[in-house]
Amino acid sequence: MCIRDRVKGLFRNYIEDLKQGVAKNMQNPGPYASENVSAGESGSFFDDYCNWNRIPEFEKVIMESPAAMVAAGLMRSKRVQIFHDHILIKEPGTSKPTPWHQDAPYYFVDGVQNVSFWSPLDHVKEASLRCVAGSHKWVKPVLPTRWIAEDSFYPDEHDYLPVPDPDVEGMEIREWEMAPGDAVAFNFGILHGARGNKTTKRRRAFSLRLIGDDARYVERPGPTSPPFPGHNMNAGEILREDWFPEVYRHPD
């Protein structure tokens, strides 16, 4: 699976749950919460991840919504495990874009059966997700960077492609006007980003990362994001199910 057009209404019946979860998350941020707007930039760009097991509304959406079943079909996987949740909130007038990046290089997950759902909780057009078609097939992964400092995440830069500028380089960029609860489904290897939010309304987005049958733990040349300290997994192992529970299994 690479990029699928909008999965219309995937979280439509859970919008209020997600809004409540986002509000709780912002009132009580987790250890990985970050404000991504630097000095001199306007607005606020808050993100946080790995909170589903302490915010009941997120857990409800993951366990009860059709997302895991849809993911199994997209990945052609018999089973689905949760990897992590992520919220990204851009206040009105935020100039900071979401930097172009692939998720895969940040993760300690190897395999092709994976999917990320990105779903807005507000109507979006200009501030929607943007994906570069075919980028999951590039010969090397794109260099992971820190969003604020914009420096390299790992020391071995030669193993990665430099972060491109898809607009300037004429790449095929796909983006969608989306209603609350719609979702874009894409592979961890897809290069993606988003513009700043220059509108007068908030842009709240919920993202859910799921993995399938072939997902295995892989060592990276430095701390990953999320880091999941103390996981005690070894290369080639299925991700431990007490931390990354199975949320769907196709009936035999």
Walk through the language-model features, giving the residues of each.
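Short, solvent-exposed loop/turn segments at secondary-structure junctions
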Residues: 4, 87-90, 105, 123-124, ...
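Double-stranded beta-helix
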Residues: 124-191
